[in-house]
């Protein structure tokens, strides 16, 4: 119809129904908007289910990066080593330990011993200090002491032993002579490379400190190895030998602060 609104026929069933152009345009826009809507968000419960199904840990076959090996080429000078020493029958225990300390250049601290000895020469701990020689076979109850490689100050090394006799008597004292093993003797000892010699007691009052400081300023301190002739490896204790001094006419040995 001229001058009227254009109509577009549509089919409803078997009949054609005219539809206006603007109505068709609006319906087309509506369909486009529906297609542009985002998809429905997945429920949180389903997401948690998927996360729970994921395997934990590293993927199969994954490994750490290899670390470079740590190689210790020598012992620390201040290390303390445990030694189990077996001494054969017929050997002098004191001479064997002294030879071991000299060859290894390590000091020994004897902690315990098991076995039997014979022909023991002891200095009794009584005030008389009598020296006795025990003949026969005695079982070791206790063996304590220290052995240092030469040169070492007199009186700083030695062994003290307590023995059980065949009749059950107990004797003991400082070993001053032979100590012959009667069968295998096993000792537990701690060995060390460094030792520091100190003379005690040290004066801590203010007057002694001022006096020591005065001697230090006057350059009258002397290294310990010049006084006692100790080997260098038994003096350092990780520091230089100059860190150890003797102070004053009383020959006190103190460490530099």
Curated annotation (Swiss-Prot):
InterPro entries, sorted: AHL15-29 (IPR014476), PPC_dom (IPR005175)
Nucleus as UniProt keyword: yes
GO BP of this protein: pollen wall assembly; vegetative to reproductive phase transition of meristem
All residue ranges annotated as the PPC domain in the record: 77-214
Tissue expression remark: Preferentially expressed in the inflorescence meristem and young floral buds, as well as in seedling-stage vegetative meristems. Widely expressed in flowers, roots and stems, with relatively low expression in leaves.
Example of a GO MF term: minor groove of adenine-thymine-rich DNA binding
Region of interest called Disordered, as start-end residue ranges on this chain: 1-71
Function summary: Transcription factor that specifically binds AT-rich DNA sequences related to the nuclear matrix attachment regions (MARs). Encodes a nuclear matrix protein that acts in the maintenance of genomic integrity by silencing TEs and repeat-containing genes through epigenetic machinery. Acts as a chromatin remodeling factor that modifies the architecture of FLC and FWA chromatin by modulating both H3 acetylation and methylation leading to the regulation of FLC and FWA expression. Negatively regulates floral repressors including MAF4 and MAF5.
Subunit note: Interacts with FVE/MSI4 and MSI5 which are components of HDAC corepressor complexes.
Domain remark in the UniProt entry: The PPC domain mediates interactions between AHL proteins.
Record-given protein name: AT-hook motif nuclear-localized protein 16
The species this protein was found in: Arabidopsis thaliana
Gene designation per UniProt: AHL16
